[in-house]
Swiss-Prot record:
Keywords: Cell adhesion impairing toxin, Hemostasis impairing toxin, Platelet aggregation inhibiting toxin, Secreted, Signal, Toxin. Residues 1-23 form the signal peptide. The keyword Glycoprotein does not apply. This is Tabinhibitin 8. It comes from Tabanus yao (Horsefly).
Amino acid sequence: MTSILVSRFKISALTLQYATSDSVNFCRIPCRGCDEKFLQCWLVASFHCGKGGPQFQKAKRVFLVRYTGGGIIVLRDSWGYRPFPMKGNVGARCVPEGLKSSPHTRGFRCLAASLECYSAKSFLGPLLCSPQKRGPMQKHNIRGDTLGKSPPCGPKGNFKGLPLVIFDGVPGVGGGLWPGKLGGKTPLFFSSNCFSGKESNPPVYKTGNLCGEKSPKKEETFKNFFFFPDPFNPNEQNFSSFLN
């Protein structure tokens, strides 16, 4: 049964969507290793495509994902996203290392990421989304609770993805779990916060700032991130090797 699932729903790429002041850019990152026993994949995002400048070429983000039959669950994220629903702020600050964000910054504002699953048939249909225009910082904020009511966006008017989307919120909106409808499914939406200064919502991992003005070294980020166990794959070294 496991081999059938892996062959039918192959996790092949991570699609990153990041919004600039005047456009939305996409790039695909190939899978860097899979564990068929647990239906897991490690994916490394290095931000080397589209617009963005040198900071995108240096920033590296690692996802450990697991296919569950109903979609993909993000188990781990080297930028500090929680792998499970919780109230309040569920993620660390979202900007890459060394890059600050403010309401007046042109270019990079918020990062949104979607996980794609490819099979012989398109089993989920287009992912409907639309930027919500409620202010300068909220221009590119995609709210999960309005997903099913919004017109499609993305390349050629639609974007196909799994029923799990990680997206960044804005100051004042806060983090949280936003339910939405997609092809009869109920996807989960995890939100973290973009920030404009030190007074924004604190990151989940308080032992180190994972991005921004006092970004820790790679080893510190790794140490702060792995303080809770992975019930599906306890071998931490397999995952950590992709940080190097």
